[in-house]
Amino acid sequence: MTIKANRRYLITPDLQIPLHHPKAVSNLIKMSKHEKFDFVLNVGDELDMTSQSRWVKGTKTEFAETLHDERSIAQDILFDLGTTDIIRSNHTDRLFTTLLKGAPSLLGLPELVFEKFMAYSDLGIRFHKRAYEFERGFFLAHGDEGVMSKHAGITALNLAKKWGNSVVCGHTHRQGATRHQTGLNGRYSTIWGIEAGHLMDMKNKASYLKYASADWNMGF
């Protein structure tokens, strides 16, 4: 890997389109265009894929036929953000899971592979199926690769300790950065766990949240 000095990254949080907060996403796009980052990394869950969820099985939501429109919205937003890299995630895994459980004979179709389904190559986006080392010692992950903590930053830090490298992730919908340092004979090493938060509209769109309440952190 070639490391360039002063390389700047934007980490975009869980959007979960169409449950995203339009104004917050608009502000993120404006900031991305103004700052002209070298790379724009997305931690996954760019789509909520609500109708593919096991929680709506047998309900009218499963038959809503909204996925095409949701995909188009996501493609537009990701393009406007200047997204360069996206990691796999549990919500976008729902496409594969739906096919596996309901129509396994379609699994061989290349157009139903998620990154092709989203036309990411046409958008100039690299899709990563495994944790991606975007800078030496720093990995982009979704956050569901380990055990989730209720404390911001700790899910990422636990992954960092497990992998021996700093980790930036989403999934928890919390924002936080925490570090772990080891040392011996005056030689120290530090790894970071960073969680990116979310940009969902909890009040108006996340109807599954009772009283629109959750210990999450909206922002970027």
Indicate residue ranges for each PLM-predicted region.
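Alpha-helix C-terminal capping segments
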Residues: 77-82, 134, 158-162
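A generic local structural motif
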Residues: 26-29, 72, 76, 126-132, ...
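Short, well-ordered loop/turn elements at secondary-structure boundaries
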Residues: 5, 36, 134-135, 161-164
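Core catalytic region of metal-dependent phosphoesterases/phosphodiesterases
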Residues: 8, 12-121
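Beta-strand-turn-beta hairpins that frame and shape the catalytic cleft
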Residues: 1-10, 132-139
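Conserved beta-sheet core of the metallophosphoesterase superfamily
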Residues: 143-220
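Active-site neighborhood of phospho(di)ester-bond hydrolases with catalytic His/Asp-centered motifs
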Residues: 11-13, 39-45, 85-90, 140-143, ...
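Active-site-proximal loop/helix segment associated with metal-binding centers of metalloenzymes
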Residues: 102-139, 143, 149-154, 165, ...
